UniProtKB/Swiss-Prot annotation:
It comes from Drosophila melanogaster. Belongs to the TTC19 family. It holds the Pfam family TPR_12. Required for mitochondrial complex III formation. GO terms for biological process: mitochondrial respiratory chain complex III assembly. TPR repeats lie at residues 97-130, 137-170, 228-261, 270-303, 310-343. This is Tetratricopeptide repeat protein 19 homolog, mitochondrial. Disruption phenotype: Low fertility, adult-onset locomotor impairment and bang sensitivity, associated with mitochondrial complex III deficiency.
Length: 369
């Protein structure tokens, strides 16, 4: 979901998929990577795969694929090595567990959430039957991520807390990347539920711990990825608090971090650039917002992702409107509407229609004057 309207500018965000309601900020639509905003995000990547989710703060164009599909696919592959090799000639209990976990992840990718939950409960019983501590922890983590994906935040936090207890019992410390990944997710969910103080404290603590880790392991890509994810989510919180300059700086730091990990051409970069443009709009720096959106659109062309381009075009139209460039605003919003219809993207169509209505309202107001 992208933030829709320049006032809504910072409204809807991504999933992995998730984010703040952009309408609270301005009127631009956030890009969306995950269903609940989160998605970047990347959002709900499970612990064992050491991934992170990103979201944005405008109307966010839906990333190709389902919520965090890439990361769930990674998780499915990861389970192959979770318990070590197995005899190909005979299906062992461990193999049956791995197969069940993989099926549950495929269900999540297809957004068959009820079926996925049933499969995970079955996997949990199987892991308990063979007394696999790693398997039990992994399944609980997947359950928590599924609940987060479904916006069942209270349930997700409870399960994540149980996972943390298990990790501590296994010898992990507060500096463990797995602990910090969960801490970041809990802080993000607190923000989405409106507990801004808890969210602020959680992000502040998590970033402090990650900074210490990076001093020891500056080239660790998993930690860098989590650092970028957490800064992006923290930036969304600051946007909600009206701290636009601080948010913009965090988004830029997150962007630089992710480029270091992935390179410039990736969905996460598009999402964060969209967030940066939202911050600029709220700071009334429209030229900077425009340039940032144009940079994001160049990336969507390299990614061949026309679905995101529609929302970005609508956001660009709203920036032109703020600048008083009516002709450019109308052209951008009409192109956004066309792209939204062509690629069956209701978020882009809605944002484009909002933009066109704003142009009409502005022109009518000028005529009356």
């Amino acid at each position: 979901m992208l933030v829709r309207n320049i006032c809504k500018f910072t409204q809807v965000m991504g999933r992995f998929r998730v984010v703040v309601n952009p309408r609270d900020y301005c009127h631009l639509a956030p890009l969306k990577r995950s269903r609940y905003h989160q998605r970047s995000e990347f959002g709900c990547r499970p612990l064992c795969s050491n991934a992170a989710g990103y979201e944005v703060s405008w109307a966010a164009p839906p990333a190709s694929g389902s919520s965090g599909g890439m990361f769930w696919a990674f998780s499915a592959a990861f389970t192959l090595n979770l318990f070590g090799g197995a005899d190909e000639k005979e299906e062992t209990p461990e193999e049956k567990l791995i197969k069940t976990i993989k099926r549950s992840i495929l269900c999540i990718q297809r957004e068959q959430y009820d079926k996925a939950e049933q499969m995970l409960h079955l996997a949990l019983r199987m892991a308990q039957d063979i007394q696999s501590k790693d398997g039990i922890t992994y399944v609980f983590d997947l359950m928590a991520n599924l609940a987060m994906e479904r916006e069942q935040f209270k349930k997700a936090e409870k399960i994540f807390t149980d996972v943390m207890k298990r990790l501590f019992a296994e010898g992990h410390t507060e500096e463990s990347p797995k602990i910090l990944h969960i801490s970041s997710k809990i802080a993000h969910m607190s923000q989405l539920q409106g507990d801004l103080e808890k969210s602020f404290q959680g992000f502040t603590w998590t970033l402090q711990q990650l900074a210490k880790l990076l001093e020891k392991m500056p080239d660790d890509k998993d930690i860098l990825e989590l650092y970028g994810l957490t800064k992006n989510w923290f930036g969304q919180l600051l946007m909600k608090q009206g701290k636009y300059l601080e948010a913009k700086n965090l988004f830029k730091e997150a962007f630089d971090t992710l480029i270091n990990v992935y390179g410039a051409v990736n969905d996460a970069s598009v999402t964060i650039l969209n967030n940066i443009s939202v911050a600029y709009v709220n700071l009334e720096k429209y030229a900077e917002a425009r340039e940032t959106l144009l940079e994001a659109m160049e990336l969507t062309k390299e990614l061949k992702d026309a679905t995101q381009e529609g929302i970005l075009q609508a956001n660009l139209g709203l920036v032109y409107l703020r600048e008083g460039l009516m002709s450019q605003a109308e052209n951008a919003c009409r192109l956004a509407w066309k792209l939204g219809k062509q690629h069956q993207n209701p978020d882009a169509v809605e944002q484009a229609e909002y933009c066109l209505n704003e142009i009409k309202t502005t022109l009518n107001g000028e005529k009356r004057q």
